[in-house]
A protein has these predicted regions:
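Intrinsically disordered, low-complexity segments enriched in small/flexible residues
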Residues: 89-112, 116, 122, 128, ...
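Gly-rich Lys/Arg/Thr-decorated short loops/hinges at beta-loop-alpha junctions or inter-strand turns
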Residues: 1-6
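Conserved catalytic cores of soluble enzyme domains
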Residues: 7, 11-18, 22-162
Length: 252
């Protein structure tokens, strides 16, 4: 698996795994049949990314959901950063995605974990329209009913997003200035700063003019490249090894 490949320093294998992971996420999004995620307990990292790519999600109230990759020195690379960039663009007021994007950036960079399905909606891991059930015994029944309802109502997959406006280099610069202040105040480490910069670079669409239009593949490629750059660093590898051994994060 990914951890084994990393520990064996097989970065080429990791790169292939990430590409396949992204293809799977996109397959969930653009499947010709409806996809409904049934969440009970934990949906962390890649699990959360799969949930975000489904047409609907049904979650038990006490589910823990989040993109926690930054805690081990990485960033979401299964489409998680791309999804937040897309959400910011789709819900932008006056065509500017940055006001929303800066909140989404904090969610990802701080590895914020929703400790309930309601909080997952607040953090935009779940949609406002997603269903929350109180009893986990009802979960599969409700999820199946939603999938059947979508299928029976003439379901069509969403159109591919080919014109996503991004915050570009101005957005990156604004976030980077905030990261500099945090670093100078010793609130984050040098490696935290690097991780934050990589996340901002991806979510803002790279070094482009603000308002430039990109497609999902552009954002996914930025994700994959940034992930591979981080996973090749000694400090990220130390964080992963420490977490696998102790179950606790390492600040280095």
């Amino acid at each position: 698996d990914l951890a084994d490949a990393l520990m064996a320093s097989k970065l080429a294998e990791v790169n292939t795994m990430i590409q396949q992971f992204q293809k799977t996420s996109q397959a969930l999004r653009y499947s010709m049949i409806p996809t409904v995620a049934a969440v009970d307990g934990l949906a962390l990292g890649g699990g959360c990314e799969f949930v975000m790519h489904c047409d609907r999600a049904v979650a038990t109230l006490e589910s823990y959901i989040g993109l926690v990759e930054a805690g081990v020195g990485l960033l979401p690379a299964g489409g998680g950063c791309k999804e937040f960039a897309l959400k910011a663009a789709q819900n932008a007021k006056d065509g500017d995605p940055f006001p929303l994007l800066k909140h989404y950036f904090q969610t990802v960079a701080m590895a914020e974990l929703a400790k309930s399905a309601e909080q997952a909606k607040e953090l935009a891991y779940l949609r406002r329209a997603d269903t929350i059930v109180m009893n986990h015994f009802e979960l599969l029944h409700v999820a199946k009913a939603q999938a059947l309802a979508l299928a029976e109502s003439g379901y069509r997959p969403p159109l591919h997003a080919h014109q996503i406006p991004v915050a570009g280099d101005a957005g990156i610069a604004t976030i980077q200035a905030q990261l500099v202040n945090l670093r100078e105040g010793d609130f984050i480490s040098e490696h935290d700063y690097l991780i934050g910069h990589k996340i901002a670079h991806v979510m803002c669409g790279g070094d482009l003019t603000p308002g430039s239009l990109v497609d999902e593949e552009w954002l996914l490629e930025l994700e994959r490249a940034a992930f591979m750059e981080l996973i090749a660093t000694e400090k990220t590898q130390e964080r992963i090894a420490h977490t696998l051994k102790t179950g606790k994060p390492l600040r280095n």
